[in-house]
Amino acid sequence: LNAVSPLAGIALCAALALAAQAASPTTATMTEDDPYLWLEDVDSPRALDWARARNAETRDALETRPDYAPAYAQLREIYNARDRIPEVVRRGDAFYDFWQDAAHPRGLVRRTTLQGLRAAEVAWETVIDLDALGAAEHENWAWKGMQCLGPAYRRCLVSLSRGGADATVVREFDVVSKRFVEGGFEVPEAKSSVDWIDADTVYVGTDLGPGSLTDSGYPRTVRRWRRGTPLGTTPIVFEGERKDVAVGVSIDMTPGYERTIFQRSVDFFRSKRFLLEGERLVPLDVPDDASVAFLRDTLLLSLRSPLTVGSETFAAGSLLVADADAWLAGQRKAEPLFVPTATRSLASWSATRDHVLLDVLDQVSSRVEEWKKDGSRFVQREVAAPFPGSIGIRALYDPLVDGVPAEAGRLARAATSDGSLAERYLFSYVDFLQPDSLMLGRTGSDAREPLKARAPLFDAAGMHAEQFFATSKDGTRIPYFVLWPKGLGAASARGDAPTLLYGYGGFEVSLPPFYSGGYGSQWVAKGGVLVVANIRGGGEFGPAWHQAAVGANKQKSYDDFIAVAEDLI
C-alpha cells in the first residue's frame, strides 16, 4: 500500500492525534535555534494569525475542487441524519435524551418511556429547548448536563455554559412544570460542582473568592448549602490543597447502603478519598489511582497499577470485588472479576441488581461477560454477542426505584416501580461495516429486543475489514484494522491504493471498530483504504498500554505509528 494519493472526492484530514501527554520540552528541544518556538504561545496574535492563514490555504484548496460541493452536501446530510441512535438515560419511568440537529443546533432535552422508545417513530416530549431558552434570555447557552434527585427525579440541577466554555451556571429546574424553580438553587458562572443531598440541601464547590479554587481553577472546597441561606455563608465541610486539580464528592443513595465519599483529585488519574462517617472523615484505604465503586455490600476496585492483597498481587487493569464492610474494617480480602492478559483488557462495567456486566476488549473488539454473586463468590457466564465489533452496555437498574434485595443482614427495600428493569440493560453494537444498533437485553439470556438501528450511510457491498499486527521498534506487536474497498484485500493489494492512516495514542482512549458515514462514503466507497492503528498511549490493552507511552516514553506512540505505516508498505 502507498499512503500518498489524495482522496478522489474530498480531501479528508488525517493525522496522528497524539494527546498532549508528552514530556515537558527539554533544554535540548527548546533552543533558540527552533524557528517555531513562537507558536508555543497559542493565544498570541502572531500564532493565531498564522493558524488563520493555514486554515485559509486549506479552505481554498478544498473549496476550489469540482467535487467539493457534492461531497460537502452529502456529508451534511450524513451528519444531520435524524435516525441517529438516541443516547438515553433512565430517570424513574422516563428515558431522557439530549438531541441536536439542523433545526435545533443548541439542542433539546427530551423524554419518552420505554414503550415509546420501542416505537418506530418515537413521540418525544420536549423538556428544555436550548435554542428557545437562549433566545428568550439573550444568551448563547450550551448544554452541560443535569443532575436529578431520585426517586421522583422531578427536581434537577441544570448546568449551562456560555458558548461551550468550561465554566457553567447551575440552576434548579422542575421537569414537570418545565420551568426553572423561582428562588431555587442557583450558582453563578464558575467551574462548579453541585450535588444533591436531599430536596433542600446540596454540596457545592465553586468560586467564592480568594482561596476557594485550586491552581487549576477548579473548586478547592466543598460546602453544605441549605435552601434559603446565602451561598457565601455556608459551612465548609471538606477542602483540598491549592496544588490539587479539584475536590469533589460522590453520594450513594442506595437505601440501606447510603455512603458519601469526598475526594481530592491530586492529578488527572489519582485521587485521595475520604468516607463520611457521622461527622467524621475517614481516609478510604484504596489505591489513589484506582476507580472505586460500591454495589450495596460489595466494593469494586478497578486498578491502574498493581495491588497486593494478602499474598496475591493483582495486575494493573484488574477489576476486584471485596466485602465492603470487611474492607472498611481493615480486613483485606479480594476476588478478581477480571484480570488482563496480553490480548484482553476491561473497557467498562455496569451493574444490574444482581449482576455485574463486563465489556471486555479481546484484541480490540468487544466481548461481554456476566458475573452473578452466589453466596460469598461470583460466578461467570459468557454472553453470546456479535464479534468482532464494539459493544456498549448500560444497566437500567435504579435502586431508588427498583428496590434493594435483603442481604448482609440488611432489610429488603421495596420497589416503587414494578421492578421490571432491575435486570435489563441497553446493548449497543457497531463495527466498520454495520451501523449502530440499540437493543434491550436481560441478564441470564442471550436474546435481545431490537429498539433502534441506523440505516446504512454508504454501500458496503464488496468492502471488508481485517486486523493485522505490525512490530514496533522495541519489538511490541501493534494491532491495526484495515477497511478495504471493493475489489481490494491483503492478497490483491496493488501497492498504489490511496491510504488513510489514523491513530490516537493518548489519554487511555481506545480505538475499537467504529462506523463512519464520512470515511465510508467519501473515502472507502471511492477506492481508498482506511487504516486504524491501535498505538500505545491509548487504552486498547489497559493501563499498561497507556503508561508505556507517556512522559519520556511518548516517542513510542510515534514509533508504533511508523511501524504500522511501514507494515502497510
Regions found by a protein language model. Give the residues of each.
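Bacterial N-terminal signal peptides that target proteins for export
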Residues: 1-10
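Intrinsically disordered, low-complexity segments enriched in Ser/Pro/Gly/Ala and basic residues
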Residues: 4, 23-25, 491
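Serine-hydrolase catalytic core recognition
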Residues: 85-88, 256-257, 353, 385-387, ...
